[in-house]
């Protein structure tokens, strides 16, 4: 039976639950004084956190409207169940977390195709991009994973995909989201401006930046050329192949690719981010995310549902 620790927030009651390794399993949280201490601090976006028993309780008045979130350091999952008395409904807010391992740039292979082996040697774990948030409309769920590392001045992404059909017709700054596409959205500077870095299975990509979905600025060709890309399917465009395929992609994204900011180093930063897999024009259309999205229809431009990405 689920046991909740409730506290009154005026018009809302929030209940903290534990999401164990992706399984919707509620566990009792005997946080006691930790809850009071976290609430007293009233930190913004993870500040003012108090630890006890491997759990971290934080009271965030800004981003969650006065909700309590608990982060389990072992499973790296967060779940906050909120009951809005006014709307008389329950809303689950989940914030996952990835810790990106720092790898000395001198240890990174010159050949991008050798980077997966380097990440293996460094023990960098995969994270499932497996949340099918709209299963009724789009039931197909390919197997997709990503792992993240960094060199201080660049983010290293390695995607691994198994799907029933693949396509790569778009070119750089084209409609890559209509192909077999992996996407990385992030807020690198904490100012509300987020970037969408989208890349199809042939390494053709686009980068957009802005504070909202409309009127986004596209990165110039010169910026795209700074992002190193490797795909196990090659770099040439191809029409849809309706046959099961397994493919991998590596992206090395320099800080300069975040063209609306001047980011010196990622080391020690914690940012908000989400990872996606889509294929708008594929026979098996799908929309998957790493961190869950609670919206009625597919929409990846939703920073309120980003998880956390911390760079060692």
Residue ranges and their predicted role:
Residues 14, 23, 36-40, 48, ...:
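Short Gly/Ser/Thr- and charged-rich N-terminal loops/segments
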Residues 25-35:
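Hydrophobic alpha-helical targeting segments used for export or membrane insertion
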Residues 94-312:
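Structural preference for beta-rich elements and adjacent junctions enriched in aromatics
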């Amino acid at each position: 039976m689920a046991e909740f620790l409730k506290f009154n927030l005026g018009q809302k009651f929030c209940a903290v639950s534990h999401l164990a390794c992706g399984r919707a399993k509620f566990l009792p949280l005997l946080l006691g004084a930790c809850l009071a201490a976290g609430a007293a601090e009233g930190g913004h976006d993870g500040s003012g956190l108090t630890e006890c028993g491997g759990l971290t309780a934080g009271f965030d008045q800004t981003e969650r409207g006065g909700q309590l979130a608990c982060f389990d350091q072992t499973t790296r999952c967060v779940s906050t169940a909120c009951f809005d008395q006014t709307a008389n409904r329950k809303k689950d807010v989940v914030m996952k977390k990835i810790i990106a391992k720092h790898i000395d740039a001198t240890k990174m292979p010159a050949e991008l195709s050798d980077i997966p082996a380097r990440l293996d040697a460094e023990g960098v774990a995969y994270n499932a991009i497996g949340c099918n948030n709209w299963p009724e409309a789009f039931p197909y769920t390919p197997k997709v994973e990503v792992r993240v590392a960094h060199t201080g001045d660049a983010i290293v992404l390695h995607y691994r995909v198994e799907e029933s059909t693949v396509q790569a017709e778009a070119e750089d700054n084209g409609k890559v989201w209509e192909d077999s596409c992996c996407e990385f959205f992030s807020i690198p500077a904490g100012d509300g401006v987020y970037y969408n870095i989208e890349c199809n299975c042939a390494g053709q990509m686009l980068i957009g930046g802005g504070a909202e979905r409309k009127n986004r600025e596209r990165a110039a060709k010169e910026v795209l050329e700074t992002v190193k890309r490797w795909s196990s399917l090659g770099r040439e465009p191809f029409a849809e192949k309706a046959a099961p395929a397994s493919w991998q992609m590596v992206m090395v994204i320099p800080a300069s690719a975040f063209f609306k900011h001047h980011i010196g180093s990622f080391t020690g930063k914690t940012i908000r981010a989400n990872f996606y897999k889509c294929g708008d024009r594929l026979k098996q259309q799908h929309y998957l995310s790493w961190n869950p999205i609670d919206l009625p229809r597919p929409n990846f431009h939703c920073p309120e549902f980003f998880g956390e990405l911390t760079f060692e």
